[in-house]
Amino acid sequence: MYPESTTDSPARLSLRQTGSPGMIYSARYGSPKRQLQFYRNLGKSGLRVSCLGLGTWVTFGGQITDEMAEQLMTLAYDNGINLFDTAEVYAAGKAEVVLGNIIKKKGWRRSSLVITTKIFWGGKAETERGLSRKHIIEGLKASLERLQLDYVDVVFANRPDPNTPMEETVRAMTHVINQGMAMYWGTSRWSSMEIMEAYSVARQFNLIPPICEQAEYHMFQREKVEVQLPELFHKIGVGAMTWSPLACGIVSGKYDGGIPPYSRASLKGYQWLKDKILSEEGRRQQAKLKEFQAIAERLGCTLPQLAIAWCLRNEGVSSVLLGASNADQLLENIGAIQVLPKLSSSIIHEIDGILGNKPYSKKDYRS
């Protein structure tokens, strides 16, 4: 794991007392409180991101109305969240359109926002997907048009592309940065070996290496973020931006009694999630949630807040992306920040005992 408190930690922490916008109030989650918001460096870059970000997968341009999307973004921004993540493939580009319209309407300073998008699946034509120089440049241009922005802060390669030479991808990412279309680039769903290859190519040809990997991370999926990415951080400075802290809602407990209507697992095209929940492994996970519920009650928080705080306790995580379909959900999730200081080493040990899936690095085996 990462050292507890070094300036080299990928998530160098700072607290900002947010002013009037940082006032959080919900009768359900307690009295009005001035929110202390964490900011962390994205990997070893100088880019400061809120430790919670708002993702737009499934929700923006799809599951929720544009009015609800605006409400969620406003709530996030007012509570110090500066990171908003999308992708060219989300709702076939509509998520980017909705996000861009809201930014324009609200009149927020562009310099106060960190906007990230992902490139890989752009359209039906053979040349409209992948990580070729052609698609990276054309895809990002199209994304910027939908977002109505001059640049994104981070452009991610949304998955590895075995059909494109790594040098071509790294050169194209360097080009879009040099052209002012993006500030940084990162990877998503890449293996450690692929990220390392991109870094080596960048160093060999004096190009720009990636600063961050977007990875799935929650109580039931730990290996990559807890073992592989820390090694990459120490070697080449790549940080972790994580998604699905509630395992697509499984950890929220809402699937305890089956698949409720209007939930993500009930949506068309999400049969894989339904199958996952109803599988033998899914049932085992549901059983463990009852034990986590008892811990959450002891800490005076909800199960989703405990799960998100658990992700945040990992200093290797620069930011955790949240998905929410209504204001109450988002407010509850933001409240995880107040649970973070309550996660003592004994509580973490207790959670590890219930999960029984703590991954071990090579270093642990040697010791």
Swiss-Prot record:
* Matches recorded under Pfam families: Aldo_ket_red
Residues that bind NADP(+): 56-57, 63, 85, 158, 188-189, 214, 243-248, 254, 262, 264, 323, 325, 329, 332-333
**EC identifiers of the protein:** 1.1.1.-
Endoplasmic reticulum recorded as keyword: no
Record InterPro entries: K_chnl_volt-dep_bsu_KCNAB (IPR005983), K_chnl_volt-dep_bsu_KCNAB-rel (IPR005399), K_chnl_volt-dep_bsu_KCNAB2 (IPR005401), NADP_OxRdtase_dom (IPR023210), NADP_OxRdtase_dom_sf (IPR036812)
Q: Which gene encodes it?
A: kcnab2
The similarity annotation says: Belongs to the shaker potassium channel beta subunit family.
What is this protein's name? Answer: Voltage-gated potassium channel subunit beta-2
- Give this protein's Gene Ontology molecular function annotations: aldo-keto reductase (NADPH) activity; potassium channel regulator activity; transmembrane transporter binding; voltage-gated potassium channel activity
Which Gene Ontology BP annotations are present?
A: regulation of action potential; regulation of potassium ion transmembrane transport
NCBIfam families named in the record: Kv_beta
The protein's UniProt keywords, in alphabetical order, are: Cell membrane, Cell projection, Cytoplasm, Cytoskeleton, Ion transport, Membrane, NADP, Oxidoreductase, Potassium, Potassium transport, Synapse, Synaptosome, Transport
Q: Can you tell me which residues form the catalytic site?
A: Y90 (proton donor/acceptor)
The free-text domain remark for this protein reads: In contrast to KCNAB1, the shorter N-terminal domain of KCNAB2 cannot mediate closure of delayed rectifier potassium channels by physically obstructing the pore.
Q: How does it assemble?
A: Forms heteromultimeric complex with alpha subunits.
Protein location: Cytoplasm; Membrane; Cell membrane; Cell projection, Axon
Q: Which GO terms describe its cellular component?
A: cytoskeleton; cytosol; juxtaparanode region of axon; synapse; voltage-gated potassium channel complex
Q: What does this protein do?
A: Regulatory subunit of the voltage-gated potassium (Kv) Shaker channels composed of pore-forming and potassium-conducting alpha subunits and of regulatory beta subunits. The beta-2/KCNAB2 cytoplasmic subunit may promote potassium channel closure via a mechanism that does not involve physical obstruction of the channel pore. Enhances current amplitude of Kv1.1/KCNA1 and Kv2.2/KCNA2 channels. May display nicotinamide adenine dinucleotide phosphate (NADPH)-dependent aldoketoreductase activity by catalyzing the NADPH-dependent reduction of a wide range of aldehyde and ketone substrates.
Q: Please report the record's description of how this protein sits within the membrane.
A: Peripheral membrane protein
